[in-house]
């Protein structure tokens, strides 16, 4: 097993321990999501966690997409896309950096590999979610790290382009991201934040 693969597997094992907080009120929620939910409830008192809606269905698989959080009063869905499968920012098929990242991921992707899963989620699934949300009239907000959430939370009128904090290229992840994660640091957000990123 390559050293890179060992690092990835250790990161994923550690992530599973954090993501699936069996003692929390919401089984499939990370500590970050629990903290985000607490803050969202201050602005959106009727918000719920782990929500599905008949308007928010994949036209390909006909399965419901899940929202991490949903506020019925403003009809707003929120997703916290911290996992690497979602990339580090929104995929844009017209962005040269995204296209370079796709080529880079494709060069590394093998069947059932992490790179293939990133391609599938970041390039294929997440853009469909955005389009389905738009077509259904659902206001849809995403964050890719805790700093983006906090920046948006303090200025909710900001657009994604105004509150994003991730680097332009995912290729940064090829070495530095996994090295930093191995040292238990979140290179895209504040590694000492109270939400446990």
Label each residue range with its predicted role.
Residues 2-184, 188, 197:
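Nucleic-acid endo/exonuclease domains
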């Amino acid at each position: 097993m390559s050293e890179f693969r060992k690092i990835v597997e250790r990161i994923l094992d550690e992530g599973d321990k954090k993501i699936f907080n069996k003692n929390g009120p919401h089984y499939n929620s990370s500590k970050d999501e629990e903290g985000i939910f607490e803050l969202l409830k201050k602005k959106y008192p009727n918000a719920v966690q782990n929500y599905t809606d008949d308007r928010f269905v994949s036209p390909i698989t006909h399965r419901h997409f899940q929202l991490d959080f949903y506020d019925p009063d403003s009809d707003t869905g929120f997703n916290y896309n911290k996992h690497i499968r979602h990339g580090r920012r929104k995929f844009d098929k017209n962005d040269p950096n995204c296209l370079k990242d796709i080529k880079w991921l494709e060069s590394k992707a093998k069947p059932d590999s992490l790179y293939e899963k990133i391609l599938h989620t970041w390039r294929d699934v997440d853009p469909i979610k955005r389009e389905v949300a738009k077509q259904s009239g659902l206001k849809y907000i995403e964050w890719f790290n805790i700093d983006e959430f906090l920046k948006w939370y303090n200025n909710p009128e900001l657009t994604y382009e105004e509150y994003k904090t991730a680097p332009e290229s995912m290729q940064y992840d090829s070495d530095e991201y996994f090295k930093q994660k191995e040292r238990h640091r979140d290179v895209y957000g504040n590694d000492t934040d109270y939400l446990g990123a």
